[in-house]
Amino acid sequence: MTVLIHVLGSDIPHHNRTVLRFFNDALAATSGHAREFMVAGKDDGLSDSCPALSVQFFPGKKSLAEAVIAKAKANRQQRFFFHGQFNPKLWLALLSGGIKPSQFFWHIWGADLYELSSGLRYKLFYPLRRLAQKRVGCVFATRGDLSFFAKTHPKVRGELLYFPTRMDPSLNTMANDRQREGKMTILVGNSGDRSNEHIAALRAVHQQFGDTVKVVVPMGYPPNNEAYIEEVRQAGLELFSEENLQVLSEKLEFDAYLTLLRQCDLGYFIFARQQGIGTLCLLIQAGIPCVLNRENPFWQDMTEQHLPVLFTTDDLNEDIVREAQRQLASVDKNTIAFFSPNYLQGWQRALAIAAGEVA
């Protein structure tokens, strides 16, 4: 049996750690196709914390891509499951035949699907990547991303799959006994990454609610982001009084982040692509509705699960937010497909498809 190899092709420590720990804790014991990994980035204790996995680390995208291509050429029966991708050399290898379509299975994380970067080298690369994506053996993604991908690549097989958000199912009912009243608290963005368009989001929140709400902006990740954090803080202070603006520059531990989310009444996400599903899941679990850009296709997944969705183009006020909270409280969160442990079934099927065990 040729064992499936999983590839984390870009050095994104928090996502890579989440995926590795999920495979170690939830999949490796029951599937031989859930144990072999090639990862761009440093070990940083991951091998020790994931003893059920065999993980090979590479110093960067280029060295990892070269190793993957060599393995693909040496054994055309070898299959690879690419998580997130983010690696131009791998896309070019798929396009040129270095990696065959039958060897290439891709879990879409969002960024490699949408063409949002304005830099010249990205704009030149996008058409090549689009051509390469036509050659993927099978894509795995959210319902919204599958729909988006199918518009340009209708012949590529697509299967529903959700990123393994770290969640405690016992907390699914935690919002039911909470009373919400008084000044609303709104979470803006899911990290300090510029893709959150924090300043535009703060302006949109101010346009809807004025300086009558408290705004919390978590910006502790990525590191070395002080200049942008200060830019967001100053823009926020032009809109909101100091007591109503909380820009968090330190990375929060998971429990502290959960506590922060539970203090919010609304999540506000202005970005036009699917991202931040982890934060969305934790907010929904806590009974906190979310405002999405209508261009963000994840709204399709939310409506499929009978969850209320608010849009950035809606006229919002406190009554509308409280009604969305009421609707969310009536949903049985144990049935939501993208919650833990429900997404496990999708992962087991994805492994079987990528390994060639099921058609």
Curated annotation (Swiss-Prot):
Its EC number is 2.4.1.325. Pathway: Bacterial outer membrane biogenesis; enterobacterial common antigen biosynthesis. One of its GO terms (cellular component) is plasma membrane. It comes from the Bacteria. It catalyses: beta-D-ManNAcA-(1->4)-alpha-D-GlcNAc-di-trans,octa-cis-undecaprenyl diphosphate + dTDP-4-acetamido-4,6-dideoxy-alpha-D-galactose = alpha-D-FucNAc4-(1->4)-beta-D-ManNAcA-(1->4)-D-GlcNAc-undecaprenyl diphosphate + dTDP + H(+). It is an enzyme of class 2 (transferase). It is found in: Cell inner membrane. One of its GO terms (molecular function) is fucosyltransferase activity. One of its GO terms (biological process) is fucosylation. It is a peripheral membrane protein. Pfam families: Glyco_transf_56. Its main location: membrane. Keywords: Cell inner membrane, Cell membrane, Glycosyltransferase, Membrane, Transferase. InterPro entries: WecF. Belongs to the glycosyltransferase 56 family. Catalyzes the synthesis of Und-PP-GlcNAc-ManNAcA-Fuc4NAc (Lipid III), the third lipid-linked intermediate involved in ECA synthesis. This is TDP-N-acetylfucosamine:lipid II N-acetylfucosaminyltransferase. The gene is wecF.
